[in-house]
């Protein structure tokens, strides 16, 4: 399995911070956890309470709350879709399928998400989507997920903030709550708290650990 994660490039010009995110094989169009890590570094270095990153995909706002960081992200509408024929045999257990930037398979249980076996070669063939996400309800207060994006060099991501743009609005509606927790069942595990901010945005709360930094 190839390593997960992103490399974040930040520039500071005309009083503004600009950010771009890259994986091994390409540029990421929005990286939530990468933004959290970059924001944590900037907030610490400049002793700020919040920071706005400008990107070609819009503004990303990072703030600190106790020992966590908050990230305001867009809320993406779930659109019903068919399972691409290339991965139809991977989705035989799916109880729902929808698309946003990503293709999302809703599975019947936490165990089904844990046991899901991806195929990188076939996932690369469905390049109309940024990634494949598998998800399931985790009781009445949250959901679990796994995130696969081999098209940009990420076999399985460890912690994916931007995946909540696809998943949180869906689970807000299904579970009847505007505040949920999300667990990413990757090798190292990821944990998020998500809240509905407006009809068009969510707030993601998470901790951040930086592996390397150069400012």
Spans of features found by a protein language model:
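Active-site proximal loop and beta-alpha junction motif in alpha/beta enzyme cores
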Residues: 1-30, 34-215
């Amino acid at each position: 399995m190839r390593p997960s994660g992103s490399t974040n490039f930040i520039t500071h010009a005309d009083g503004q911070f600009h950010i771009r995110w890259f994986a091994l094989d390409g540029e990421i169009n929005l990286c939530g956890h990468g933004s959290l890590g970059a924001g944590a570094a900037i907030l610490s270095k400049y002793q700020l309470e919040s920071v706005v990153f400008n990107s070609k995909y819009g503004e990303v706002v990072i703030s600190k709350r106790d020992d966590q960081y908050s990230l305001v992200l867009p809320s993406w509408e779930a659109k019903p879709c068919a399972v691409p024929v290339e991965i139809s045999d991977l989705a035989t257990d799916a109880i729902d399928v929808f698309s946003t930037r990503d293709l999302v398979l809703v599975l019947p249980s936490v165990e089904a998400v844990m046991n899901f076996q991806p195929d990188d070669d076939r996932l690369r063939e469905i390049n109309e989507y940024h990634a494949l996400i598998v998800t399931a309800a985790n009781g009445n207060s949250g959901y679990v997920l796994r995130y696969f994006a081999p098209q940009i060099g990420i076999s399985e991501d460890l912690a994916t903030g931007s995946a909540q743009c696809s998943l949180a609005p869906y689970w807000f509606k299904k579970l009847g709550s505007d505040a949920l927790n999300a667990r990413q069942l990757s090798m190292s595990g990821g944990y998020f708290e998500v809240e509905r901010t407006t009809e068009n945005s969510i707030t993601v709360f998470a901790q951040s650990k930086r592996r390397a930094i150069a400012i």
